[in-house]
Amino acid sequence: MNAVTDLKQDYLVADINLAGWGRKEIAIAETEMPGLMAIRDEFAAAQPLKGARIAGSLHMTIQTAVLIETLKALGADVRWASCNIFSTQDHAAAAIAAGGTPVFAFKGESLKEYWDFTHRIFDWADGGTPNMILDDGGDATLLLHLGARAEKDQSVIAKATSEEETYLFAAIKEKLAKDPSWYSRNLAAIRGVTEETTTGVHRLYQMAQKGELRFPAINVNDSVTKSKFDNLYGCRESLVDGIKRATDVMIAGKVAIVAGYGDVGKGSAQALRALSAQVWVTEIDPICALQAAMEGYRVVTMDYAAEHGDIFVTCTGNYHVITHDHMAKMKDQAIVCNIGHFDNEIDIASIEKYEWDEIKPQVDHVKFPDGKKLIILAKGRLVNLGCATGHPSYVMSSSFANQTIAQIELWQERDSGKYPVGVYTLPKHLDEKVARLQLRKLNAQLTELTEQQAAYIGVKKEGPYKADHYRY
């Protein structure tokens, strides 16, 4: 990929001439994103994000373009990079760059370019710093915290344990050589972060528990209208889209192994079963395993499943769920892919020594010593974004409405003391608001409680209707 940067412009995209195409698709997406567009309309006049300078690290797709333009419509200044080397839609990036937003993203970035671009979202053209982060997976948040630690003690970036860390540590060392206080200066300016996904939320809670987190964070992922919709219904549609575009495989009759039965795993299993695959599930959590069994899925271990499966999908957010030994046991032509956030769910590093034959972008044949070949999709990264275009606009509207509300909440309350350093979730009434806005598109008719009914169950007539501990 020969990415293009115009020296007169503060962006780096694959081809700025794709902007017209991107703009047309953005216009279509807006009609499918009722919640996000309603929030844009509601708050545009008040400009609740005026003064906010948001460093965004999230998949640079058409749907994200609508989010970026919503943040700007509400008064924010924005700089953007993708949170995945394969997830950018180049026409979306071009449209956003052509509209005047600094964006650094193209499909097929190298890891060196990825960390360069993540640094660039913190380098404002006027020499200033951002004051907010909008993150997906936690890389932007990690970068500042780790870099600030390395300013004091470079031993924290001395020993890389993965290819990803090798490039991250090298990027931090290079930045420190040029500007020894760059990370702490940017870190001190951040007033809060909103985090999109399960993996990033895990990182935030770990940092908070260790006392390492330096600013307040809102966990957008655990808003009901995010995790129970984006993670479940989004994956239910985009997983098979990615597998089909990549391989044209017939799903029916195949044994499909779904590793993990959280919301992402549930949606993935539903999608594969809907196309008549025989779905097996692996799980560590007895509650999730029981849910899978009660839905009629066979619950097995990966050690057992490895030699039987035709299609393998990891959905755990964990490390080395599929190991080299598992892949060595798999059938010839088995399809292996991941719909969790990072590529280390599958031990890709252990098979890099073998012969790789690229069939087409993000589809590789990997030849094992015994002559067997596996089909590896998106090099173990997100299959739905690497091999297709990710979740549909409608379901992303829920997620991005929550992101926008969370950015407004943190920015408006930045000096109030409401959010000391820690990890928070949005209140139930805002979750319900997003759901109401989304329902308009579906021509749904909500039943209204009478005053007597509301009193009987002990809620307000206008909601919220469930306690915070309620499990949807």
From Swiss-Prot:
Keyword presence, Phosphoprotein: no
Subcellular location: Cytoplasm
Cofactor: NAD(+)
Keyword DNA repair assigned: no
A Gene Ontology BP annotation from the UniProt entry: L-homocysteine biosynthetic process
NCBIfam families membership: ahcY, PRK05476.2-3
Keywords linked to the UniProt accession: Cytoplasm, Hydrolase, NAD, One-carbon metabolism
Positions contributing to NAD(+) binding: 197-199, 231, 260-265, 283, 318, 339-341, 384
Protein name as annotated: Adenosylhomocysteinase
Disulfide-bond pairs as recorded: none
Molecular function via GO: adenosylhomocysteinase activity
Function: May play a key role in the regulation of the intracellular concentration of adenosylhomocysteine.
Main location, first listed in the record: cytoplasm
Enzyme class: hydrolase
